[in-house]
Amino acid sequence: MDVGQKKRGADKTALATTDEQGALSKPTWIRAKAPISPEVGRLTGILRDLHLHTVCEEASCPNLGECFKRGTATFMIMGDVCTRRCPFCDVAHGRPAALDTEEPGHLADAIGAMKLKYVVITSVTRDDLEDGGAAHFAQCIESIRKKTEGVKVEILVPDFRGHVDAALKNLGNCLPDVFNHNLETVPRLYAESRPGARYHESLRLLQRFKETYPGIPTKSGLMLGLGETDEEILEVMRDLRVHGCDMLTIGQYLRPSRHHLPVQRYVTPEQFEAFRVAGLKMGFSQVASGPLVRSSYHADLQAKEVLHT
């Protein structure tokens, strides 16, 4: 495969196409506003002018319209081609291009132009880099803080598989305000839904970051509907607390296309609320739990209490 060439859909996941007639119907509570407004066009224009990507667009997030209308976005750095091919995700797979050394500056310029005060920076997984891209994260944070004033930065990182020591060291060059790494699902479903990832290694990443930088809040996210049970979710939540995770997001998995993993169930708003209450009882400082919640959805509001801003 050529550098920069993208694989999506069936080419990426290698899953058999599923008959849509057999798919579960979306319930009435799965509703997201269409991303059509002048503000969406304005923000998209800024991003394209600076050659930036948002996970909102690349992962077909159901909240894109609402978040763009509010003037917020989650930036995806290090390109838009991922070295992994998770069958729940709509980000393209392939051989990524070299890092763009001008990206940190462009990112800071975009944040200034968009007048943001809280930003989330995430990335594709870059198994091809010696530190998984951690130094690039730190460079982006440093550039934001040099060019803007008072902006809080949350990073949503991959698992840095095989590069954790180097990643933790390089992140220390310029630390975020919040460190986020998603477990995504329960350990029983990892082989199918997160090929290449390891449940306990992801837990350990959260724990090691907390041990290394104890003053930085940690966060993780789960998506429901891949075939997990309620008790399995509660067990993962307990594991996260044991490993020092402070904040949690829980949302509904929505299938990007018929070439991705099918939705096994739609969790009711009442059950999402039960998970939220259970999480607070376990000791999470903040739990956002609902059908359309994503790890970066209203991240500024969730972090407000923790960061005392």
UniProtKB/Swiss-Prot annotation:
Pfam families from the UniProt entry: LIAS_N, Radical_SAM
List the Gene Ontology MF annotations in alphabetical order.
4 iron, 4 sulfur cluster binding; lipoate synthase activity; metal ion binding
What pathway does the annotation place this protein in? Protein modification; protein lipoylation via endogenous pathway; protein N(6)-(lipoyl)lysine from octanoyl-[acyl-carrier-protein]: step 2/2
Cofactors, names only: [4Fe-4S] cluster
Keyword vocabulary terms for this entry: 4Fe-4S, Cytoplasm, Iron, Iron-sulfur, Metal-binding, S-adenosyl-L-methionine, Transferase
What does the cofactor section's free text say about binding? Answer: Binds 2 [4Fe-4S] clusters per subunit. One cluster is coordinated with 3 cysteines and an exchangeable S-adenosyl-L-methionine.
Q: What top-level class of enzyme does the UniProt entry assign?
A: transferase
The entry assigns this protein to a family as follows: Belongs to the radical SAM superfamily. Lipoyl synthase family.
Name of protein: Lipoyl synthase
